[in-house]
Amino acid sequence: MLTSTFNTTKSEEIFAAAQKLMPGGVNSPVRAFKSVGGNPIVFDRVEGAYVWDVDGNQYIDYVGSWGPAICGHAHPEVIKALHAALDKGTSFGAPCLLENVLAEMVIDGVPSIEMVRFVNSGTEACMAILRLMRAYTGREKIIKFEGCYHGHADMFLVKAGSGVATLGLPDSPGVPKSVTANTLTAPFNDLEAVKALFADHPDQIAGVILEPVVGNAGFIPPDGGFLAGLREITQEQGALLVFDEVMTGFRIAYGGAQEKFGVLPDLTTLGKIIGGGLPVGAYGGRREIMSLVAPAGPMYQAGTLSGNPLAMTAGIKTLELIRQTGTYEYLDQITAKLINGLLTIAREAGHQVCGGHISGMFGLFFTAGPVHNYEDAKKSDLAKFSAFHRGMLEQGVYLAPSQFEAGFTSLAHTEADIDRTLEAARVVLNQL
């Protein structure tokens, strides 16, 4: 998989130049490898389950562009569809049939969505859905969960992922306290904390938003009854329940977490997979609520590139591919083999670890666990994870460069890829 010696000379040169051109040398912070040390490798191309860097090193990829590459990178049918779409233009700024097609697929696939609006990113979708929550309820406060990430909009940068654990204070300079004052936080998987917030702020909370399976504090699944409990509480309080399924939508089941767990939210955000690797986001829900969105209603939201034909094309083809029989069974099979193998090898090597998976989404923590929330996740041995990440990179395996990010498999990953990954892990974990 690698060249005879692990050489990243070209990556180092390109990244050094990038740091003079872009803040930190990247266009999204996690890419800079700050959490794991060293400098990032610079990609040259991707295909299937593999990525190649500019030095010619090949890696088995478990990041998948942070989730969209569920079919594998550069799937030939997606590429073919995009070539045909390019011949018609890159952006219309006007209605096109492709929007209808993808909208129908999303509505058919996601149980709670009756109407949908396309945007250009998950952050945009979450920004819009917060405005919609407030417009519909006439209330201003929201509840989010520690470690859940809903994009980089001001109102969500409170205890977001690896943010500062302070009460009601923003996790980034430049975010006014007045903006985050209406953002209430609770520990994930803690229904009593949610009930207490509603009791402390009667008739003031517009809704509860969460990643139904946390992926931005590492992989943290919901405890049994947690999602159903939130549904019950919000209905009792006249508040909305919002699932941020940017990561889990079409990933852990075709209908996302709401299909997997049988709990229907009022509103849902989507992204990643529905764009097939191109920039996209969406939000949707009950017709009654979505009818407030302009121009049907008074809640304004717009976007120059929203619904652009290239993203719609890639999304349509991707959903066509993954709705075929056996997709999620296969993802579950190979991901179970991967995470169970990693856990076994790590424990045999004397490390305290825990982890798990749902379909093609997984995570591993260097702590005995269990991990139920962000505070539990922070008990992970970050130095050990960093060494593990670097060792796996040198063995030709590309993992997310942060302990606080979930990993992903794809339909392009084979049993042989998993075997090679576990062989690499055995070498690395026995050396830590």
Swiss-Prot record:
Keywords, ordered alphabetically: Chlorophyll biosynthesis, Cytoplasm, Isomerase, Porphyrin biosynthesis, Pyridoxal phosphate
Subcellular location per the Swiss-Prot or TrEMBL entry: Cytoplasm
Cofactor(s) recorded in Swiss-Prot or TrEMBL: pyridoxal 5'-phosphate
GO cellular component, one term: cytoplasm
Catalytic activity, EC: 5.4.3.8
UniProt pathway annotation: Porphyrin-containing compound metabolism; protoporphyrin-IX biosynthesis; 5-aminolevulinate from L-glutamyl-tRNA(Glu): step 2/2; Porphyrin-containing compound metabolism; chlorophyll biosynthesis
Pfam family for this entry, one: Aminotran_3
A molecular-function term among this protein's GO annotations: transaminase activity
Catalytic activity, as annotated: (S)-4-amino-5-oxopentanoate = 5-aminolevulinate
GO annotation, biological process: chlorophyll biosynthetic process; protoporphyrinogen IX biosynthetic process
List of residues that carry N6-(pyridoxal phosphate)lysine: 272
Primary location group: cytoplasm
Domain of life of the source: Bacteria
Family statement: Belongs to the class-III pyridoxal-phosphate-dependent aminotransferase family. HemL subfamily.
Subunit note: Homodimer.
Protein name: Glutamate-1-semialdehyde 2,1-aminomutase
Organism (species): Cyanothece sp. (strain PCC 7425 / ATCC 29141)
Protein's gene: hemL
